[in-house]
From Swiss-Prot:
The gene is trpA. Pathway: Amino-acid biosynthesis; L-tryptophan biosynthesis; L-tryptophan from chorismate: step 5/5. GO terms for molecular function: tryptophan synthase activity. This is Tryptophan synthase alpha chain. It comes from Thioalkalivibrio sulfidiphilus (strain HL-EbGR7). It comes from the Bacteria.
Length: 266
């Protein structure tokens, strides 16, 4: 059983939902990332999503675009991000880590080379936001052969045939994007989310995570009532940006928000 599957099974047994924070690796500097990962786990994170900085993050809003820019000022590469996970694993062998980013850096590294390096460092999953499921077969096969879960996004606009295709390709969990548009966008309609999750559950037994639009403890709690996991990104990255000159303070305010969310979800 994979680390992600084990984590969801333990949460289910405890009657709890997963809290999944997203941060961009290398933001505001490379030395901050591993301590931030540990701080988030201490604050109640169940799975960590680690963004791989990319020069053209078209699915992301300005908050995460700027996080990528801050990380790329330090020339943070995919190999370095994998190295950060390896360092994190020296002290934490249990918390699943999913890399989230764009296909180009993985293609440049090569699917096989990436999967081998990621698996040996302790990466549990990969979410490539710009890889359509129709074109994902080769990467999915390579990831699975090395025990890395391919994770996919579903959107409010996803039709039934696409939902089925994605659920067939995915493992670990399925990530439902609760809003149209880019990350960091506006309001959240939990009833509409619940309706869409019911349609997705007809095609998979995988846990369903919901992200986009989760900003505070209240929205995290409301989404946790209908989803298996709550993903929070821009709200955390905003706080990191506000404390760019004092990363330790940034880690503290990120931890405070996650602890509030965890308490509200439980």
């Amino acid at each position: 059983m994979s680390r992600i599957a084990r984590r969801f099974e333990a949460l289910r047994a405890a009657g709890r939902k997963a809290l999944i924070p997203y941060v961009t690796a290398g933001d505001p500097n490379p030395d901050n990332t591993v301590p931030l990962m540990h701080a988030m786990v201490a604050a109640g994170a169940d799975i960590i999503e680690l963004g791989v900085p990319f020069s053209d993050p078209m699915a992301d809003g300005p908050v995460i675009q700027q996080a990528c820019e801050r990380a790329l000022r330090h020339h943070v590469s995919l190999r370095q991000v994998i190295g950060m996970v390896k360092t994190f694993r020296e002290q934490d062998a249990e918390t699943p880590v999913v890399l989230m980013g764009y296909l180009n850096p993985v293609e440049i590294m090569g699917y096989e080379a990436f999967a081998i390096a990621a698996a040996s460092a302790g990466v549990d999953g990969l979410l490539t936001v710009d890889l359509p499921p129709e074109e994902s077969h080769d990467l999915v096969q390579v990831l699975r052969s090395h025990g890395v879960d391919p994770i996919f996004l579903l959107a409010p606009t996803s039709h039934e045939a696409r939902i089925k295709r994605i659920c067939d390709a995915a493992s670990g969990f399925v990530y439902y994007v609760s809003l149209k548009g880019v990350t960091g966008a506006a309001t959240l309609d939990v009833d509409a989310v619940a309706e869409k999750l019911a349609a997705i559950r007809a095609h998979t037994d995988l846990p369903l995570g919901v992200g986009f639009g989760i900003r505070d403890a209240d929205s995290a709690a409301r989404v946790s009532r209908v989803a298996d996991a709550v993903v929070v990104g821009s709200a955390l990255v905003n706080r990191i940006a506000e404390h760019e000159q004092d990363p330790e303070a940034g880690r503290r305010v990120v931890s405070e928000l996650l602890a509030e969310m965890r308490k509200a979800m439980d």
